[in-house]
Amino acid sequence: MSDTNSAWIEQNLQRQRKMLEDKQKQKRHQSAGSVRTTTTTSSMSMNNMKDYPAFETSLPFSMSDHTSNMNTPLIPTPQAPPRNHTLTTRQSSMPATDTLIQINDYPENDISAKLSKVNLTPCVVSDDEDSDRRSYRESPWHNDIVADKIKTDILPDYNYIKNNLQKFVDEPAQEHCLYRCSITRHKSGVDKTMYPTYYLHLEEMDTDKKAKIFLLAARKRKKSTTANYLLSTDPTNLSREGDGYCAKVRSNALGTHFTIYDNGHNPKKTDNQFSIRQELAAVIYETNVLGFKGPRKMTVIMPGIEPGNDSKPAVRCIHRPVLEKHTLLEKNRSGDTNSLKVLTNKSPQWNDETQSYVLNFHGRVTQASVKNFQIIHPNSPEYIVMQFGRVSEDEFTMDFRYPLSAVQAFGIAMTSFHGKLACE
């Protein structure tokens, strides 16, 4: 009798999966015929930002920035395109004209070259490192393609960052400024596979030497029942006792809910309210309960920001919960988010020709991986708050801007490295 019930349940699940797959395929076919434009006019962009403010202050775009490739969305390819099918994309250096890209200029099997020419990066749907590795080895990308870049108004103050590292990593990013960073994963020692060390460097953009400034290091703690990453400004001492210890990332048992804390103490272990740890951000990954594979869906919750002005920078609001119901995760679950900022990942678009989900990373990400993502505000989807993705087996790029801090962005990146049992 139990075998009959099990067989019936399995058949029912398969039938539900088939119905949902058919619905998803039908939606993709209905939306596959249109090719979205790549840029909007300055006036339209300004009007949209006024109608849908994402943050307390205006979004950091200059008038020249509206023709930049920050406003270059994905170009979905129609299913089974004709041989002379063309895609239109707009170059930031020539805002008044369009450049045509001929899909059939490349060999039929060279999908990576086609995607590269329109700055699209495929997203694989497995959290397995071997799957990621197979993905980019089977579809190599070409280094000779001139990559698109996200433009920004001003460069970071590199001297200030070098002289005030501990302060810089904790404060919100300067407005109108983009911080281009790289993450290197270093595997060494007996436990190199389980406990690698991650190093975050800021890329200096005002020099031809491609110099880098060390910002943070992170490592997963041993003998911890759940994911527990320590973040430090001292790469030689990744411990809670080290002077550089500034934050930690903690997850639930499934690896679907993460909280980023500062270096304060658990409220259950201290009587000093000023030493209680702050919650810097929380990250939620949506679970795939029926076993369907697809792009990860992320939600990022963070405390509000007190906007800055000419005399003072923006300041993150302090969020020190003592009770569980006041945590970022619980406030988001109950819908009490008026004083918080809630961000989401930008949904990849399905590409019928490559049979994969793709995102436009503006040339900063070159390898397919389930870890690749872009964080946006729902009301301003073209304002990329953060993007993260793979460029080689152990190298990744991480770009962030206001209102995130370096610690928040690096902590969010750490959540992507951790395996998620219920998300695949």
UniProtKB/Swiss-Prot annotation:
InterPro entries: Tubby-like_C, Tubby_C, Tubby_C_CS
Region named Disordered: 19-47
Subcellular location(s) per record: Cytoplasm; Cell projection; Cell projection, Axon; Cell projection, Dendrite
Keyword terms, alphabetized: Cell projection, Chemotaxis, Cytoplasm, Lipid metabolism, Sensory transduction
Compositional bias (Low complexity): 37-47
PROSITE patterns assigned: TUB_1, TUB_2
GO cellular component: a single term: dendrite
GO biological process entries: chemotaxis; lipid metabolic process; positive regulation of neurogenesis; protein localization to cilium; receptor localization to non-motile cilium
Broad class of where this protein is predominantly found: cytoplasm
Family membership: Belongs to the TUB family.
Functional description taken from the UniProt entry: Has a role in fat regulation independent of daf-16. Implicated in ciliar sensory function which is required for normal sensory behavior such as chemotaxis. Functions in life span control via the insulin/IGF-1 pathway. Thought to be involved in neuronal trafficking.
Subunit record text: Interacts with rgb-3.
Family annotation (PANTHER family): PROTEIN KING TUBBY, TUBBY-RELATED
Name the record gives this protein: Tubby protein homolog 1
Organism: Caenorhabditis briggsae
Gene that this sequence comes from: tub-1
